[in-house]
Amino acid sequence: MSGLTIFSDQQPEKPLWQSHDAEEIQQQLTAIGVRFERWQADCELGENPQPEAVIAAYQHEIDRLVAENGYKSWDVISMRPDNPQREALREKFLSEHTHGEDEVRFFVEGSGLFCLHLNEKVYQILCEKNDLLSVPADIPHWFDMGSAPNFTAIRVFDNPEGWIARSTGDNIADGYPRLA
């Protein structure tokens, strides 16, 4: 079940607000300029989905995002618990960073934890299957895929080469709850 937990950026041990209600999550995130929607990810992809099959299955949704926002490219990220690079990739995404473009993800399988740092707060968004999340450019954030990652998400980009992360140098992510 999708969820949102909001913390002060000074007190990671004490949540200020928490919900698993999609409408409440959407209201909180819309207030800070972040798009959160529940779409339908109802295509069976199998155990190890190939990127081409995922894109073909959800081309209509990709076309919708491109038409709405002018995105230029897209790809698929799929991570499984047996991926030999999972620990290194998890560490890479756990560092707070920004992008010069929106970070758009449509989860078609599994889950991941997006953490946004703005307005002296940390917003932890547990994204699950059917969740579309669009984080505007330049918002500091990090992503936790967990120690046994299991998700497939479509990523949509402004830049045809994909996103380029810029580290903030802040170690704030180290103090907040992570996925198991």
From Swiss-Prot:
The record marks 102 as: May play a role in transmitting local conformational changes. Keywords: Amino-acid biosynthesis, Dioxygenase, Iron, Metal-binding, Methionine biosynthesis, Nickel, Oxidoreductase. The record marks 96 as: May play a role in metal incorporation in vivo. Its EC number is 1.13.11.54, 1.13.11.53. Ni(2+) binds at residues 97, 99, 103, 141. Fe(2+) binds at residues 97, 99, 103, 141. Pfam families: ARD (PF03079). SUPFAM superfamilies: RmlC-like cupins (SSF51182). Binds 1 Fe(2+) cation per monomer. It is an enzyme of class 1 (oxidoreductase). It catalyses: 1,2-dihydroxy-5-(methylsulfanyl)pent-1-en-3-one + O2 = 3-(methylsulfanyl)propanoate + CO + formate + 2 H(+); 1,2-dihydroxy-5-(methylsulfanyl)pent-1-en-3-one + O2 = 4-methylsulfanyl-2-oxobutanoate + formate + 2 H(+). One of its GO terms (biological process) is L-methionine salvage from S-adenosylmethionine. The keyword Oxidoreductase applies. Belongs to the acireductone dioxygenase (ARD) family. PANTHER family: ACIREDUCTONE DIOXYGENASE (PTHR23418:SF0). Catalyzes 2 different reactions between oxygen and the acireductone 1,2-dihydroxy-3-keto-5-methylthiopentene (DHK-MTPene) depending upon the metal bound in the active site. Fe-containing acireductone dioxygenase (Fe-ARD) produces formate and 2-keto-4-methylthiobutyrate (KMTB), the alpha-ketoacid precursor of methionine in the methionine recycle pathway. Ni-containing acireductone dioxygenase (Ni-ARD) produces methylthiopropionate, carbon monoxide and formate, and does not lie on the methionine recycle pathway. This is Acireductone dioxygenase. It comes from Yersinia pseudotuberculosis serotype O:3 (strain YPIII).
